[in-house]
């Protein structure tokens, strides 16, 4: 076969593959993405319609699905019912280790969104006081991971307390009704418990809160990298809008949560929105959480946590959020 003919065949194959990739992307008619009250940027994105505006010229619609916690977002991603989901970084790592095919691609917040919470009348003032007590928690979320690490530091384990597994809103209700003694809280519900019922945050550790990250299913990222970049472009527009329109951000959160201005102000006081690129700071924080969970027995000893973190964090799309 002549060199010219071989080059023509190679060119034809390359063109065919490029056409196939374009066709695969063109087949996407709907992007399914979550919104969550623990992710203020997602609420701005939904409310302002930035993503719809970005995609409308290609006839791609947007379907919004609410996530009540990282565990729900991971459940939706694993089931293939959403393409993009909001979680805490450490929760995403647990999902990845458990076989959830996801990539973390963007930072939507650096929050102090979880702490250990109790009522004034319980006498609980430190983590050691939780021994034998009933603690409400949502398994597989940053508050759950935060609780495990706090117990570990106090030389306790989950076996030393009575875990009551509830979704975040039900955890707050259970605490206020007296059904549990403590709660691994999550904002804005935690802020509401503070402001509205005088709940006390008896253990705080901002450094043990992991970053808020946006995740995408591996298959979607592989088949539609250009669309992923466009989603992040819209996300970045929403994040910058939130930073420069703080009063409107507060109003948006009030509208979605049905909570008071005072509660949302408390949430926003401990929510930083100045980061977006995912990289080494997130790797370091998530790795530290993973190693602590492995030491506590939540992650099996034979798991290579560092490899799992490296597999989770995908920096390819970082330029889309600059």
Which ranges hold each PLM region?
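N-terminal export leaders
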Residues: 5-9
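Bacterial N-terminal signal peptides
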Residues: 10-19
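Sec/Tat signal peptide C-region and signal peptidase I cleavage site
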Residues: 20-26
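Short, glycine-/small- and polar/acidic-enriched structural segments
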Residues: 27-157, 162-167, 181-184, 200-201, ...
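Short, solvent-exposed loop/beta-turn-alpha elements that line the ligand-binding surface or hinge
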Residues: 52-60, 273-282, 305
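Pocket-lining segment of extracytoplasmic ligand-binding domains
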Residues: 90, 163-164, 169-255
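Secondary-structure end/capping motifs
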Residues: 222-300
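Conserved C-terminal helix/tail region of periplasmic/extracytoplasmic solute-binding proteins
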Residues: 294-322
């Amino acid at each position: 076969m002549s060199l010219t003919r071989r080059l023509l065949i190679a060119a034809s194959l390359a063109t065919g593959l490029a056409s196939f990739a374009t066709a695969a992307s063109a087949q996407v008619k709907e992007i399914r993405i979550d919104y969550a009250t623990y992710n203020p940027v997602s609420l701005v994105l939904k409310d302002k319609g930035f993503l719809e505006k970005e995609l409308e010229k290609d006839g791609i619609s947007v379907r919004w699905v609410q996530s009540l916690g990282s565990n729900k977002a991971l459940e939706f991603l694993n089931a293939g019912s959403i393409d993009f989901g909001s979680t805490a970084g450490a929760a995403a790592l647990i999902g990845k280790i458990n076989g959830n095919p996801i990539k973390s691609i963007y930072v939507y917040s650096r929050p102090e969104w979880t702490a250990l919470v109790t009522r004034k009348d319980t006498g609980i003032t430190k983590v050691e006081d939780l021994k034998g007590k009933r603690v409400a928690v949502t398994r597989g979320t940053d508050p759950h991971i935060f609780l495990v690490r706090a117990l570990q530091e106090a030389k306790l384990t989950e076996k030393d307390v009575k875990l009551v597994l509830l979704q975040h809103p039900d955890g707050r209700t259970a605490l206020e009704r007296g059904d549990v003694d403590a709660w691994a809280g999550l904002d804005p519900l935690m802020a509401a418990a503070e402001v509205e019922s005088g709940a006390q945050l008896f253990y705080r550790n901002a450094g043990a809160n992991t970053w808020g990250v946006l995740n995408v299913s591996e298959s979607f990222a592989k088949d539609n990298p250009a669309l992923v970049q466009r989603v992040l472009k819209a996300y970045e527009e929403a994040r910058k809008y939130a930073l420069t329109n703080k009063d409107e951000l507060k109003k948006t959160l009030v509208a979605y949560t049905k909570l008071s201005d005072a509660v949302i102000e408390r949430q926003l006081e401990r929510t930083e929105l100045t980061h977006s690129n995912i990289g080494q700071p997130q790797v370091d924080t998530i790795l530290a959480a993973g190693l602590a969970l492995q030491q506590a027995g939540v992650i099996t000893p034979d798991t290579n946590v560092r490899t799992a973190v490296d597999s989770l964090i995908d920096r390819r799309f970082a330029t889309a959020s600059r």
